[in-house]
Amino acid sequence: MTSKLKVNILADGGDNAILTSDGSGSLTLNNDAFKNTPSFQAYLGSNSSNLTMGTATKIEYNTESWDVGGCYNNTGSTVNLNGLSATAYSFCPNVAGKYWIYATARVDASSNFPHDAYFAIYKNGSAVNIFQRVAQSTDFNGTLRLGAAVDMNGTGDLIQIYVTLYDGVNAFISNYSSSTLFGAYRLIGT
């Protein structure tokens, strides 16, 4: 024995469509609670400023791959996004929730000396998640990776990515679009 429930619209008690079907198997989620948005991904389109020992440097991810919801500022100045003030190279979502924040950065040095590096997610100007890389050889050139779930209030919290080098020579962030990335998406159900 089999049962079928055939509907074109699944609605809540207020008759708001949560899910619709076009009758051919294509479904559309109409409720934002079921979507991983806002979301974005950006990469470094050109070499950033040189990294100086002991100085936290904001990475200028200036080229967007996508920006669903218009919440990433890929410019060098403060702008208004969805009614919120977003500082340079920051993600400032206008929807509250937990977000998966991820970043990578390709660090290259002109000479081969060991480096220690701190790669950090900054929320509202303070580090909330830090990854430390200690070079085990004389060649530091490599990609730093970082990811964390971060609570965002949807009314002005913003995220930026910084890198700080210690114990070595100055270096720079390379503009490899596949290895110098910054992105975020809202986690469903949070």
Language-model regions: role of each:
Residues 15, 22-113, 131-134, 169-190:
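Terminal (often C-terminal
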Residues 4, 13-15, 85-87, 115, ...:
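Residues that act as N-cap/strand-start positions at coil-to-secondary-structure junctions
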Residues 135-142, 151-153:
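Short proline/glycine- and polar residue-rich coil/turn motifs
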Residues 112-126:
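Short, surface-exposed beta-strand/strand-loop-strand elements in extracellular ectodomains
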Residues 1-16, 188-190:
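Short, intrinsically disordered N-terminal pre-domain segments
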Residues 123-139:
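Solvent-exposed beta-strand/loop surfaces of large extracellular or lumenal domains
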Residues 97-107, 143-147, 157-164:
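Extracellular beta-strand-rich recognition modules
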